[in-house]
């Protein structure tokens, strides 16, 4: 065991995966914990954290955990459910399911600064009308051009969630909805990360809907392909 989360200010419930840098440092998120004054949960269990685990310098030594950011349910969002990804410059990207200025979730960037400090930047705040999607549960993927691709588990024109792309445009980002899930038969509630093939096509899953009736009105879920 490398680290046991203690809840409270340490963080709790790491639901997403990890990413590793060239030095062997691990980066990840916790869904809760951190700031105990967070208002996203009524029982004040915290809005989540982004953390690193540094490899010990000596064999058999302890890994050192450090929080990079504590989510506050302010403009920085809340409850990062997916893991982080890392670009060629070492910046980290992820999603927060809730919070932010409109309460519908965010896409964020963590950028390392001098002195070991990390700066949290919200690069997209999902709108309150839900048309671009809301509540992103999954992490992101990154292509060679620096575009980010992801899913929102709900919202969109039919309420079943969306697939989206964020393209860097100078110091800002351009957001595009690639697909709106409609429920039956194409699925709803995409909750896991996407993958690419060599041609740039996207593949993923939805938790609900599809043509199968064995799971009742919600459906049993789907596997999908999208051609960007």
Annotate each PLM feature.
Residues 1-228:
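Extracellular beta-propeller repeat domains
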């Amino acid at each position: 065991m490398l680290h046991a989360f203690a809840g409270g200010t340490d963080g709790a419930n790491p639901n997403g995966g990890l990413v590793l840098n060239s030095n062997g440092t691990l980066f990840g998120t916790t869904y809760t914990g951190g700031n105990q004054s967070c208002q996203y949960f009524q029982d004040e269990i915290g809005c989540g954290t982004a953390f690193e685990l540094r490899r010990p310098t000596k064999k058999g030594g302890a890994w050192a955990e450090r929080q990079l950011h504590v989510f506050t349910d302010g403009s920085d969002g809340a409850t990062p459910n997916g893991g982080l990804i890392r670009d060629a410059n070492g910046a980290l990207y992820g999603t927060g399911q809730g919070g932010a200025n409109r309460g519908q979730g965010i896409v964020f960037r963590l950028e390392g600064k001098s002195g070991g400090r990390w700066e949290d930047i919200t690069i997209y705040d999902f709108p309150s009308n839900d048309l671009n999607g809301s509540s992103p549960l999954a992490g992101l993927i990154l292509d060679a051009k620096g575009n980010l691709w992801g899913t929102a588990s709900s919202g969109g024109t039919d309420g079943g969630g969306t697939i989206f792309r964020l393209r860097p445009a100078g110091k800002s980002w351009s957001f595009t909805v690639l697909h709106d899930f409609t429920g039956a038969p194409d699925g709803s509630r995409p909750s896991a990360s996407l993958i690419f093939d060599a041609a740039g096509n996207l593949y993923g899953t939805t938790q609900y809907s599809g043509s199968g009736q064995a799971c009742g009105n919600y459906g049993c879920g789907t596997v999908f392909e999208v051609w960007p």
